[in-house]
Amino acid sequence: INNAGVMMPAKRIATADGVELTWAVNYFSGFMLTLRLAGLLEKAPAARVVNVASIAMGNPQLTFNQCDGHNYRPWHFYITSKLAQAMMAVKLNQLFQAAGHSVMV
């Protein structure tokens, strides 16, 4: 279950890699964990990956001028990170199914 989450830090915080914290935790951490576990998931008879998203993802409004930190709006990063998480789940499910694995995302 990918359910790590950061919601609306008061200021833009970047990871050591320069990734905005909300995106790093809400999207990239679950994505990387799932990729790292893919081999084990593919060997399991009925593996499942659950991504916990948010209803807020239905209203993304991120523009590129908000990505540099000068016009930081935490809510927009939260919304788009959760949308990206849901989109990633759809794509990973397609990839696992196309490869003939029973993993459900």
Protein language model features and the residues they cover:
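Catalytic loop of short-chain dehydrogenase/reductase
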Residues: 5-23, 42-102
